[in-house]
Amino acid sequence: MGDCWSRRRVVLAVAAALFLSSAAPVHAATEEAAVAPIQLLVDGLVEIMKAGPATPFQQRYATLAPIIDQTFDLSAILQESVGSFWAPLPPEQQAILTDAFRRYTVSSYVNSFDDYKGQRFEISPETRAVGNEQVVETKVIPKKGDRHELDYVMRQSSAGWRVVDVLADGSISRVAVQRSDFRRLLTRGGAQALAESLRTKSADLSDGSG
């Protein structure tokens, strides 16, 4: 009886070890795939920061826009921010909102990352799983002053891993903040009011050149 139990324990231990050894490469591959878009984004941000205010806003915008398209699932973010208002909208209004939201998102990043003063970015190679999503932790570290944490919530789509939310200081959801603002505008004036607000914000962020 004792020998039988010992053999069972050995078999179970070997099985567990085999499972863990096979699961580890899969998890590592998932982490690498989820982190890759954020590395692309950070490289783009550093590029426009080094270009700086001396480079026209629209030129920096043109540099970053395709990178945002490759790293963010803007459609998913917009729909999550708009919520139940989205489905009833005619396709043409959805397209208008999507275009305005894309311009606003890119303009926000170009405006926020507008000058390079020795800042560096740290991207954690290890992600944090939350349901079917992966959180990529990043830090913006200035030469002087406090560091800032920006965590990117990644979700896998047919196009690969894409950002579906950004957590400022590790907890403040950009989608949640937008949701309150967007739905208030939709309630008051519908899709047109939201689109106009996004266009106005984009123009303000770009000093009228957006």
Language model features with spans:
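Low-complexity, intrinsically disordered terminal/linker segments enriched in charged
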Residues: L167-G210
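Short beta-strand edge/turn micro-motifs at domain boundaries
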Residues: R147-V177
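N-terminal export leaders
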Residues: S6-L12
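Early exported N-terminus immediately downstream of N-terminal targeting peptides
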Residues: E31-Y109
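Extracytoplasmic
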Residues: A33, D43, Q59, T63, ...
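Sec/Tat signal peptide C-region and signal peptidase I cleavage site
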Residues: A24-T30
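Surface-exposed, charged secondary-structure patches
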Residues: V106-H148, L198-G210
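Bacterial N-terminal signal peptides
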Residues: A13-S22
